[in-house]
């Protein structure tokens, strides 16, 4: 079992506008540290002494980095922080201090390195604060990272900050038929001595249906294959590549059962259907791989030294 803690706007006294500002500006609000302290104290008490509880995810898919730094709401952007209104002056002043400390005269001369250094500082501040708070109340369970998603998981500064403070780096892994070799090689370097976990992945199949009507399968990040057997083949191939890296400690298939989106359209994410009927052709492939994990680990260990 794992538990997730999140950056929310409950400590602000007003609703935060995700469509105007990057959520990570909330890190610098005067009440944030107190809010996190109360939240961790409350959640950690639920699992005190629980030997079956693995640990905590700090959050889910935080907006550390966006594709090609194109969206300041989905990725930390120095200019975005510098332009924040008075309501978020603490985050703006943090960015202004960064500019002064690095001798950057104006936004017009901000370099790519400046941008990445600032992203790394914000990520470091986040992970240092949150992990220290967790350890204040819970020293027995693991801190499982923040389920990095999209371009955040490909960013060196972000991954390194996570690995510096968390017990492992967790990534939600979509939009690929199999793990990319260059990304896995980067993770081995960026994570250092820390392992990584694939905290979310799945694939959907076109043959899923409810009472004779095929699923819409339009919701979610997982791609689409033809059959449940193909889902099983995807699962085996994906997980074999993870085992081959030798620094992946596991994966979490998302999710247990099929479900509906907000418009009532079904999506084939589960290992069982909406009616809780198991997808046997998918599960047989999953079972075959899962029961072979330890022998496969031995195989890849031996192969790595040959």
Functional labels for PLM-detected ranges:
Residues 66-72, 181-182, 208-210, 263-264:
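Short, solvent-exposed loop/turn and secondary-structure capping segments
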Residues 11, 59-63, 148-151, 174, ...:
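Active-site beta-loop-alpha junctions enriched in small/polar residues
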Residues 2-7:
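Short, small-residue-biased leader/transition segments that mark boundaries at the very start
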Residues 27, 50-140, 145-157:
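Polysaccharide-binding and catalytic clefts of secreted carbohydrate-active enzymes
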Residues 73-85, 254-306:
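Aromatic-rich peripheral "rim/lid" segments of glycoside hydrolase catalytic domains that contact
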Residues 108, 117-132, 136-220, 236-240:
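Glycoside hydrolase catalytic-domain groove-lining segments
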Residues 53-54, 60, 199-201, 218-272:
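Substrate-binding cleft of secreted/luminal carbohydrate-active enzymes
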Residues 15-47, 187-188, 209-248:
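Ligand-binding grooves and catalytic loops that recognize ribose/phosphate and carbohydrate rings
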């Amino acid at each position: 079992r794992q538990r997730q803690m999140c950056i929310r706007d409950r400590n602000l006294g007003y609703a935060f506008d995700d469509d105007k500002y990057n959520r990570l500006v909330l890190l610098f609000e005067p009440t944030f540290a107190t809010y996190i302290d109360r939240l961790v104290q409350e959640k950690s008490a639920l699992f005190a002494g629980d030997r079956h509880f693995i640990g905590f995810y700090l959050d889910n898919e935080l907006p550390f980095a966006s594709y090609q730094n194109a969206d300041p709401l989905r990725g930390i952007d120095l200019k975005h922080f510098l332009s924040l209104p008075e309501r978020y002056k603490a985050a703006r002043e943090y960015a202004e201090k960064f500019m002064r400390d690095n001798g950057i005269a104006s936004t017009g001369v901000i370099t790519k390195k400046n941008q990445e250094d600032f992203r790394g500082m914000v990520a470091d501040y986040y992970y240092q604060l949150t992990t220290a708070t967790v350890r204040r109340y819970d020293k027995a369970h693991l801190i499982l990272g923040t389920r990095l998603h999209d371009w955040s998981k490909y960013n060196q500064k972000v991954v390194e900050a996570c690995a510096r403070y968390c017990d492992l780096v967790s990534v939600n892994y979509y939009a690929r038929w199999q793990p990319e070799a260059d990304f896995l090689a980067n993770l081995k370097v960026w994570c250092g001595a820390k392992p990584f976990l694939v905290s979310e992945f799945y694939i959907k199949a076109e043959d899923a249906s409810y009472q004779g009507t095929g699923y819409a399968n339009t919701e979610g990040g997982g791609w689409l294959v033809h059959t449940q057997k193909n889902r099983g083949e995807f699962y085996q191939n994906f997980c074999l590549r993870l085992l081959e890296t030798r620094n992946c400690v596991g994966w979490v298939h998302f999710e247990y059962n099929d479900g509906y989106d907000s418009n009532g359209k079904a999506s084939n994410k589960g290992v069982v259907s909406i009616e809780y009927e198991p997808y046997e052709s998918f599960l047989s492939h999953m079972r075959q791989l899962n029961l072979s994990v330890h022998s496969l680990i031995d195989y890849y260990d031996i192969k790595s030294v040959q």
